[in-house]
Design a protein with these regions (language model features):
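Mid-domain beta-loop-alpha active-site segment that forms a flexible
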Residues: 117, 141-156, 175-185, 210, ...
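Substrate-binding/catalytic subdomain of NAD(P)-dependent oxidoreductase enzymes
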Residues: 159-203
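Short, well-structured beta-strand/strand-turn elements
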Residues: 5, 296-310, 372-377
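N-terminal helix-loop segment corresponding to the beta1-alpha1 unit
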Residues: 1-167, 198-199, 357, 363-385
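A short glycine-threonine-serine/GTX helix/turn-capping micro-motif
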Residues: 135-146, 168-170, 202-203, 210-212, ...
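Short Gly/Pro-enriched turn/cap motifs at secondary-structure boundaries
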Residues: 35, 198-207, 212-213, 271, ...
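Aromatic-enriched alpha-helical interface/lid elements that frame and gate functional surfaces
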Residues: 211-298, 302
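Terminal low-complexity tails and localization/encapsulation signals of metabolic enzymes
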Residues: 216, 258-259, 310-385
Length: 385
């Protein structure tokens, strides 16, 4: 987004470098693709905040910075005398954004957490999965990513305020609350209906009917919106290839006045399930792309449940030049990156540098702070950088 971002790591490197998946570098050593993905376009320095000299260098950097973003436990930076109050005296316009599991206040503020714990405390697993089975965790960790995106938005807003008022502020982001914001219309249910929203899994409520939205096909799954035009389209497709019952052929879901309190075992539900079973059987012998191409040609709300490999080969993403090959010196080869999440006509986003190695920009950044080469060498020898 145009900012110069400096990633500060301990002299031995961030623990994030130990997070998989891994691939071998040019020397045959495993390197984290997670690190490579989330730290492109950043400069990297190594600095020990546990030493007086390291903290003095950090304060010099703070004095020249617009914002800092960190995810230490609440109170940790204060214990080093480099918390928000101290930093604000050095740089009154500074925006200090903290991302922690439960925020910096409240009875859980000091608790250590993991993605699973924070997601669970935020309610995400409870609304995920099937109603007749236990809650499930979304496969890839989400809490930190959701909190990070909210921290980004809040930091940009705080920077705008700082620019206009010359006054910085502390932005306190709770992962638990960030996760809660992903629940959308589930949160008002207890207050309005006296009950929690139930897990729907591959189904969605259509009045009293649990309408299937995910169907197995020959090579995977497709998602379908069970509205009239889509159902009519698939019934028409079936009638072209197989013989179907007249009752199914004349089916029209819109003729029913379905309400949440309608009989779930009534005639309407029975007819709907018969149609659903017929569609389920028909789709089981079709491939994802057969189904998707038919849906596109007929304007039906159906899409394949893409695997990562499917996404990688998506003609839509290819047409938007989404994938970007970036040369990584550590790997000695190009690594394919996800491209920018949006396109800007006048100021296009791009990946212009790979993720940094440990301390790869030490000399550049420390020189800008008035630290000479001989001092940098001495700091490195003492393990401060």
């Amino acid at each position: 987004m145009g900012a110069e971002v400096i990633k500060i790591e301990p002299p031995g490197g961030s623990q994030t470098r130990l997070r998989g998946p891994f691939t071998k570098d040019s020397d045959g050593k495993p390197r984290s693709l997670y690190w490579a993905s989330y730290n492109s376009n950043k400069k990297g320095i190594s600095l020990s905040l546990d030493t007086d000299e390291g903290r003095q260098i950090f304060l010099k950097l703070v004095n020249k910075s617009d914002a800092i973003l960190e995810s230490f436990q609440p109170g940790y930076l204060d214990s080093l005398n480099i918390g928000f109050e101290t930093l604000a005296k050095i740089n009154p316009k500074l925006v200090h954004t903290s991302m922690t599991p439960f925020g910096s206040t409240g009875p859980y503020a000091g608790f250590i957490s993991t993605d699973l714990i924070t997601s669970s405390m935020g309610g995400m697993p409870f609304v995920s999965g099937d109603e007749d089975r236990p809650p499930v965790r979304i496969s890839f960790p989400q809490a930190e990513l959701v909190a990070g995106s909210q921290a980004f938005g809040a930091t940009v807003a705080a920077l705008r305020h700082s620019r206009n008022s010359k006054t910085g502020q502390h932005v306190d982001v709770s992962e638990q609350i960030a996760v809660m914001w992903t629940l959308m219309n589930a949160t008002p249910f207890p207050q309005l209906h006296g009950t929690d929203v139930t897990r729907a899994g591959a189904f969605r409520k259509r009045g009293p009917i649990d309408a299937r939205h995910v169907f197995r096909c020959a090579d995977g799954y497709v998602s379908m919106n069970a509205q009239a035009k889509t159902l009519d389209g698939f019934i028409g497709w079936m009638s072209e290839e197989i013989e179907i019952e007249k009752e199914i052929l004349g089916f029209n879901i819109d003729k029913w006045n379905l309400k949440p309190d309608s009989d779930p075992n009534g005639k309407e539900a029975s007819e709907f399930k018969k149609v659903e079973k017929a569609i389920e059987s028909f789709l089981s012998i079709k491939t994802k792309m057969e189904i998707f191409e038919r849906a596109l040609s007929a304007g039906l709300l159906v899409a394949p449940c893409n695997t990562v490999e499917d996404i990688r080969k998506s003609p839509q993403l290819e047409a938007r030049s989404f994938w970007i090959d970036v040369y990584h010196p550590e790997f000695g080869k190009d690594i394919t990156h996800l491209g920018p999440y949006m396109k800007m006509s006048e100021t296009p986003l791009k990946i212009y540098s790979p993720s940094p190695s440990v301390g790869s920009h030490n000399e550049e950044i420390f020189k800008s702070l008035g630290i000479g080469k001989s001092e940098i060498k001495a700091l490195r020898k003492r393990g401060i950088i």
